[in-house]
Amino acid sequence: MQQALTFADVQSVKHLAKKLKQAHPELPHGKRLNLAAAELLGVRNYHELNRRFQAVIDQYLDSPSGPNAVAHCLYCDFRFAADLKGDQREHRENHERIMEVHEITGYRPGTYVEREAMKTDGYTKARSPGSLEDRIDGALLILRGWFDRSYHRAIDAGQWRKHPSFETYVALMVPYIEGIFPELAPSLAQRYGRTPGVIAHGQTNWPLQ
């Protein structure tokens, strides 16, 4: 097994273990997980698979030393006490949710720091004396920062499949943009459309269903 493990790899092993119950009804679930891990991924057992997958997750951790230190995952943006089992488990669940969406869609919503950087850059460009197109690009950066926060929220709620695409989200936000950048809103509406009434004025999160 040369490539880094994915969320889909682990799920495939779990699914095969369930199917193996028909061929090996005498084996407990743990033994069937071992068989599935060896058959699909060539590892010795499920414990080794789980250990390697945890290493894939942990590579993104920023873990300062010292008492009461808070670890921060630079991938899923989760902050937790790294020495607490419950926090470790909660981080893994959160990380796997983001990882699953990333693998399926090819898109990972930005972390808080990434979103704030996009918005800061966006406001600078949108308010600059540059060309209209450059200013529109700035507005789109702001919208991307808002979109990522909204999308992350939908992932946490298990509703990411229902969340609008970025293009649709822009159309939902045009009525709000009209109050912030009235000179840019018509161009955004022409490009993406204008859909009022879905996201409340002054809000930036798509309403969960």
Where are these regions (language model features)?
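Short cysteine-rich clusters marking metal-coordination/redox-active sites
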Residues: 70-76
